[in-house]
From Swiss-Prot:
Species this protein is from: Plasmodium falciparum (isolate 3D7)
Enzyme class per UniProt: transferase
Catalytic activity line of the entry: S-sulfanyl-L-cysteinyl-[protein] + uridine(34) in tRNA + AH2 + ATP = 2-thiouridine(34) in tRNA + L-cysteinyl-[protein] + A + AMP + diphosphate + H(+)
Pfam families reported in the protein's UniProt record: tRNA_Me_trans
Full protein name: Putative tRNA-specific 2-thiouridylase
Superkingdom field: Eukaryota
Summary of the function given for this chain in its UniProt record: Catalyzes the 2-thiolation of uridine at the wobble position (U34) of tRNA, leading to the formation of s(2)U34. Required for apicoplast maintenance.
GO cellular component, one term: apicoplast
Length: 1084
């Protein structure tokens, strides 16, 4: 370069002289002198430049030969002129490389032709020519990470808004988001390899951030607050893939498998880890000890001769976490493992997390990486020891364990003697054991996908807020029933709720399904004279069966990648019901909302029960002559084994339905028809909340976009008069109304009967104050036609109604209208009779007098009993309805306290344990009775019979009192007959036939109508030892003197339907006399 400058200026000087001579010829001497001066100045300028260039050349040769020596320390920085020179050299593709390790003194030289440090693959991938270990080099090799973090830290500190910080983070990874961000693997229950990435990626890229080996698994990382998959590739001896001798490391933070398993056979390895005489070594060591143990393993002699390179790749469906990981992991690509362990990654990630104000559990991610490295190196050590120590003695094995090669705790060196048997086994046995365990290694704690039933009210909205707090993936579903006005109002609120917060919403039209599954069966029940419960039918058939079908079809459409349709159903269904589920499944989200209210099963009692069954079967054969004993034993065996159920047996987990914290708004009455398998799919977030708490939360947070009116009446219909709805569907045309009038005129009698025409129903429509129906003929014309064409011909609606007064023994009215009342009902009957006698009141002179008080129109009439008789000859249905004004008489005590049950459905699928225990007590009492009677009968004679009975009565009064309190054929149970009522105590007596029983309530009820559903409960208490004790005496625990203050929970056992009422003999005779007086035959 200097020679070039020399020749350039030399020729230029000659050229200038040549020009001057030319001018000398033409011009005068004055101009010649000026040009000569200018050329001399140029010559001096050339000389100075040449001297300066020689000086710099001398200095550069001096810098190449010099060696800089200084003591090694992390905190000491290299001098400023060397650092500045490094920056200039990096542009020319130079780098610090070779280091000689001599008493911690570093000698630094410069090398040519090495890859630039600014690339991503800059981290020690190029050190193929090294012969010695570069333990001193790690601060310089990892300097790019520190510099990048410092830049980010300085730039983000100036930003104050959180949104701007996140935008900055996204800008740093803008190219990554476009290329690498694609949907996750749906089957989270399994790990996947990088071959699976091609299925979801448009390009041919087989990695997310850094490229990993082909056989490396992407495994799920638990407890990170987001879905995160991570792949860690550790290579030894410059191999591209992992050695085949080293097997996959166990998953970190798994509950079933211990994370510190160093030998593949876990059963034998547990015996080597006895600490503090009883305690086993914990699954997760402290992080400081774990890092020290990794460094100690890397400092072994045979490890210093080898290269250990690490690359980390990760993926998350959360884009913010994905970009955050990219900033940290982009430099960890084929990095030396020793230098990686000396980087303080935990401190770096903690600072970045505080900068960006993120909520992710970053500490747990780094613990996962360190634990994976720890397990990998331990397995590598053991694999190496196995090859050397096949015939090792017990003493040598103890020394291996004590020298901190396998167990890193120096204080605890108590190791058992059972050692060599583990190493003598074949490798095939170890592989089979590990493969079996790998099926259950992945225990996922991901946020579940939930299908939430959003109705537009307060309760469902509060449940949605609680689910979103826990970061569940929620999709909202609304059941749209266009025939009801309440659903039209609710859909407005539902749309506002989902629009404001950008929530998912699916609207399901259920007009046809509700008509076929709920409305038609309900009308058939009423036609047979029974009183159904459409709310329970709606929960079972629409909100569960039909809803599951809809969910599957929607999810197929939603997750349809390319041509492959992958079905991934929702994990749970959530509702706004006030109920609680108790389960021992720790992964069930119901434990989050009920404060982990689960109890462990007892294993000891199961064995005793099996032995007792065999003993009792033998006793049944011996005691055939005693009828009382046969009766009790047959019931016990019948309910233990012979009940037919369609439920699958699941011995691991149980799911029990409990009453919620708000006992007034409790809705377990509507959920009692579900079995335990169906309950396992439900979540009830409002289990511990009351209605006051919900409204208080809404007021404090200023949430008003919900329907403030409470839903009452029929399910999805709202407030509706049942009698008017029955008239709409059962009364066909106007001709039928005329026929009803003619039949009533023929039935008319002068004695104790007043004529009533069906014009009453038509005149009511003209009133202004009349309540409007929610169901109109215009909106449901198709359903009405379908019902009249297909279902009415199957029904027999030819009624002849008798309204009978039990107090005066008279008949109030006979008609052929539809009077299908429930027992205990008073509103519709009294309105009917008041309007009848006010409108049709006839004076003696023939003039009508309206609104005249009389005996009938001034009282409230209540339905006490009803009976339906079918006349096969005339095809008429005689409907006898018995009414009274005084419902609190002693004559009606039995009919208000007793009934017969059938179709008993237990939630567990078998007789509950709280009732089984009562059978055992009664059997013990009966056995004692037998022994006493058998011993006494030996010495009885005709002479001493009377004397013996007197002695027996006087001497055994105490034992008789105990037997009277607990009769052998009755069991205590608690009952709720209607949703709005409280839980009552009752006695139940099971019959010999299957699924039938007799019920007796202590307190008087409003009435038991056939077809009505009753829910069965039993209270219990949880003691300090987490043991459940079922109780029968509530006064003991509700008392103010109680010091324990145990809360009483109610366990919902199941449901049953009322088949008929219990008629007392006195009431039967009273009804019989009325029929004889009025010439009404009971045989009709």
């Amino acid at each position: 370069m200097l020679i070039f400058f020399f020749f350039f200026f030399f020729f230029k000087y000659i050229y200038n002289i040549f020009i001057l001579t030319c001018f000398y010829i033409t011009l005068s001497s004055y101009y010649f002198i000026i040009s000569f001066i200018f050329s001399t100045l140029m010559f001096f300028y050339f000389c100075t430049f040449y001297v300066i260039s020689l000086f710099f050349l001398y200095i550069s040769s001096f810098c190449k030969s010099i060696k800089v020596t200084q003591l090694y320390d992390k905190k000491i920085k290299i001098k400023s002129f060397i650092n500045n020179y490094l920056v200039s050299c990096r542009k020319k593709k130079y780098i610090y490389n070779n280091v000689d390790d001599k008493s911690n003194i570093g000698t630094f030289n410069l090398y040519h032709n090495i890859r630039d440090n600014n690339n991503n693959n800059n981290n020690n991938d190029n050190n193929n020519n090294l012969k010695k270990r570069d333990d001193v080099l790690f601060p310089l090799c990892n300097k790019n990470i520190i510099n990048d973090v410092q830049k980010i830290y300085d730039e983000v500190n100036n930003i104050k808004d959180k949104e701007q910080k996140i935008n900055y983070l996204m800008e740093q990874c803008s190219s990554l988001c476009k290329e690498n961000y694609f949907p996750p693997i749906l089957n989270l229950n399994k790990a996947y390899r990088n071959k699976r990435i091609d299925e979801f990626n448009k390009g041919n890229k087989n990695f997310y951030i850094n490229e990993v080996g082909k056989n490396i698994w992407y495994k799920y990382v638990n407890r990170c607050d987001e879905i995160l998959f991570m792949a860690i590739d550790i290579q030894i001896d410059e191999d591209e893939q992992r050695n085949n001798s080293i097997k996959d490391v166990h998953d970190v933070h798994d509950d079933n498998i211990k994370t510190c398993t160093l030998i593949k056979d876990d059963k034998h390895f547990e015996k080597y880890k006895d600490i503090h005489n009883d305690n086993i070594l914990k699954n997760i060591l402290p992080l400081d000890k774990k890092i020290d143990s990794i460094k100690n393993m890397l400092n072994h002699k045979y490890m210093k001769k080898k290269k250990c390179i690490i690359t980390i790749d990760a993926y998350s469906n959360n884009l913010i976490l994905y970009c955050f990981l990219y900033l940290i992991l982009k430099h960890i690509n084929k990095m030396y493992l020793y230098s990686f362990m000396n980087i303080q990654i935990k401190e770096i990630t903690a600072k970045l997390k505080e900068l960006f104000d993120l909520h992710f559990n970053v500490h747990h991610i780094i613990d996962y990486i360190h634990e994976y490295i720890y397990n990998f190196l331990m397995s590598y050590h053991i694999k190496r020891k196995k090859n050397k120590s096949k015939n090792m003695k017990e003493k040598d094995i103890k020394n291996v364990f004590a020298n901190n090669i396998i167990i890193s705790d120096e204080e605890n060196k108590h190791i058992s003697k059972e050692s060599s048997d583990m190493y003598k086994k074949k490798t095939t046995i170890t592989t089979t054991t590990t493969t079996k365990k790998k099926k259950n290694t992945m225990k996922l704690f991901t946020y579940p996908r939930i299908a939430h039933m959003l109705s537009g009210g307060v309760d469902s909205l509060m449940a949605l807020h609680l689910l979103e707090r826990k970061k569940f993936y929620v999709d909202n579903y609304f059941f749209n029933f266009t025939n009801a006005d309440c659903s039209k109002n609710d859909i407005k609120y539902v749309k506002d709720i989902c629009k404001n917060n950008k929530r998912n919403l699916f609207i399901i039209n259920i007009n046809d399904e509700y008509f076929d599954e709920v409305l038609v069966p309900m009308l058939f029940f009423y036609a047979d004279g029974k009183v159904p419960n459409p709310d329970i039918m709606c929960n079972q058939k629409i909100k569960y069966n039909f809803f599951l079908k809809v969910i599957k079809s929607i999810y197929k459409q939603k997750w349809n990648y390319r041509t492959k349709s992958k079905l991934c159903n929702y994990d749970f269904i959530s509702t706004g019901h006030y109920a609680m589920i108790r389960t021992n499944d720790k992964n069930n989200p119901n434990n989050i909302f009920n404060n982990n209210l689960f109890i462990k099963k007892k294993k000891k009692k199961i064995k005793n029960i099996k032995n007792k069954k065999n003993i009792k079967n033998k006793n049944n054969i011996k005691n055939k002559n005693n009828n009382n004993n046969i009766y009790t034993y047959n019931i016990y065996n019948l309910h233990n084994d012979n009940i037919k159920t369609n439920y699958k047996k699941n011995n691991k987990y149980f799911y029990k339905l409990l009453v919620s914290n708000d006992k007034k708004k409790d809705q377990t009455f509507f959920l009692s028809s579900f079995n335990h398998i169906q309950l396992s799919k439900f979540i009830f977030p409002l289990s511990l909340y009351t209605k006051k708490d919900v409204k208080k939360y809404m007021n404090e947070n200023n949430i008003n976009n919900y329907n403030h009116k409470e839903t009452k009446g029929l399910c999805l219909f709202g407030n509706i008069d049942m009698q008017t709805l029955l008239h709409k569907y059962f009364v066909n045309t106007e001709k039928d109304d005329i026929k009803n009038k003619q039949n009533e005129d023929n039935i008319f009698k002068e004695n104790n009967i007043l004529n009533l025409n069906n014009n009453f129903n038509q005149n009511e429509k003209k009133k202004k104050k009349e309540k409007k129906l929610l169901v109109d003929i215009t909106t449901t014309s198709s359903h009405l036609k379908k019902f009249r064409e297909t279902f009415i011909p199957k029904m027999n609606l030819h009624y002849k109604n008798y309204l009978i007064n039990l107090d005066d023994q008279t008949i109030l009215d006979i008609n052929s209208d539809i009077h299908l009342y429930a027992i205990g009902q008073h509103k519709n009957v009294t309105n009917y009779l008041h309007n009848l006698y006010n409108k049709k009141m006839i004076n003696i002179n023939g003039y009508k007098k309206k609104h005249v008080k009389n005996v009938i129109s001034s009282f409230q009439w209540i339905v006490v009993y009803k009976k339906i008789k079918r006349d096969m000859s005339t095809n008429l249905i005689h409907n006898f309805i018995y009414l009274t004004k005084n419902y609190d008489q002693d004559l009606f005590t039995h009919i208000r306290t007793k009934c017969k049950l059938h179709n008993i459905k237990w939630i567990e699928g078998k007789l509950p344990a709280c009732i089984k225990k009562q059978f055992k007590k009664y059997n013990k009492i009966n056995k004692k009775k037998k022994k006493i009677n058998n011993n006494n009968n030996k010495y009885k004679t005709n002479e001493t019979f009377h004397v013996y009975n007197n002695i027996q009565e006087s001497g055994k009064k105490k034992k008789k009192k105990k037997v009277k309190n607990i009769p052998h054929d009755e069991k205590t149970i608690f009952v709720k007959i209607r949703n709005s009522e409280q839980i009552k105590k009752a006695k139940i007596k099971f019959s010999l036939s299957n699924n039938t029983a007799y019920l007796k309530v202590k307190q008087k009820d409003t009435g038991f109508s056939p077809g009505q559903i009753i829910t069965l409960y039993f209270p219990f208490i949880i003691k300090k030892n987490n043991k459940v004790t079922y109780i029968t005496n509530l006064n003991k625990y509700n008392n103010l003197i109680n010091t324990n203050k145990n809360t009483i929970y109610y366990h919902c056992l199941g449901s049953a339907t009322i088949s008929n009422q219990f008629l007392d003999y006195n009431l039967y005779q009273h009804i019989k006399n009325i029929h004889q007086i009025n010439d009404l035959n009971m045989s009709k």
